Amino acid sequence: MALQTYGGFTAQANSMTGVEFSKLYNPLHLKRVTQMMMFDKYALAQFIPANSGVKTMFCFRYRSLKPATTPLTEGVLPTETAIVREKVDYTVAQYGSFIKYSDQLDTFDVDNMKAQFTDILGDQAALTGDVVIRDVISAGTRVIYAGSATSRATVISGTKLIEVGDLKLAALNLKNARAEKFKAINSGSTKIGSTPIRSAYVGIVHPNVVEDLRNLTGWKNIEDYAYTSDIMENEVGSWGDIRFVENTNAKVDTAGAKPVYITLVMGKDAYASVSVRGKNGTEMIFKPLNSGGVENALNQVGSVGWKMYCGAKILNELFMVRIESVATLDVGDLIRYADNTGTVSDATTIE
């Protein structure tokens, strides 16, 4: 079957129309694979004011003081107390993407592709923000190598799975750092409002690692909870003070002989998501066929795109720890329609 390219994509084609006439078209759009967006739900939302002239802001954190347990002596002034103030910078960058389409495609194609482009690009924008946050917080300084391994390399060489001892160590690290447990999570893409949950630390885990968690002593599936009214989206179960939500977008390092999975366990205010005040959403941009100057002299090209401001920052390293492990069932993404790596009969790339 001949393929013909138009603008930003390749359509399944016959002649000059980009439409195959030998079969009846069904306007039903089959569901495509999308990622679960999660990392901004547990972030402290921060905003840089628009028109402020800066892309970077900073805030201060004052360290707590030790108890003053020495009794005062009459008439003697004690030594003054030193205070330590830490500065934390956070910044944003701009991200965006677009798809072009031709006038012939707009005229002859039977599908409402512009509506589909908008939907697909919206998913891409959300995934972009999720990955930006994920990559920042997955690079923190607090790390537990599964099964008493001493490095990522020994996690791989020893085929170290996540263990009860790793979860105990993660929870104790957060408790001893006096990290606050989550009692509510952000709700909605604008991060305005929150949903109450049962007090706990939160672990974000890849589905492959979830299967190893289910084998651990003390693991509790969500169907075994005494109360199910406050189950978080994509929550799969809990162990001790940690409630786990699974996410196919969890960080996986594939540089070694085996994939290493990053399970993040965190308390409240461990990290921030950063945007620009008044521009914290995604701006969808539509350029119709009659837009542009001499570069589009014959009104042959239009486009649909998005752009947004996004950033992330670890606010307190002590409030977050990552567990690095391999997985027993190392099931890869065999077909990923979302990132165009799958091979499907009659599939075409739109260029």
Q: Would you name each region that the model predicts?
A:
Residues 105-187, 334, 343, 349-350:
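Alpha-helical scaffold segments that mediate packing/assembly in large oligomeric complexes
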Residues 35-97:
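Assembly/oligomerization interface modules of large self-assembling protein complexes
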Residues 82-109, 276-277, 281:
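Short acidic, glycine/tyrosine-flanked loop/strand segments centered on an H-E-D-like triad
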Residues 92-94, 198, 299:
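Short, solvent-exposed loop/turn segments at the edges of secondary structure
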Residues 185-188, 192-194, 209:
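Divalent cation-coordinating acidic motifs and surrounding scaffolds
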Residues 2-32, 36, 155-183, 201-202, ...:
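Sequence/fold signature of self-assembling virion shell proteins
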Residues 58-60, 100, 202-204:
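Structural recognition of the beta-strand scaffold that forms the well-ordered cores
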Residues 50-51, 195-197:
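Extracellular/periplasmic catalytic domains that process cell-envelope and extracellular macromolecules
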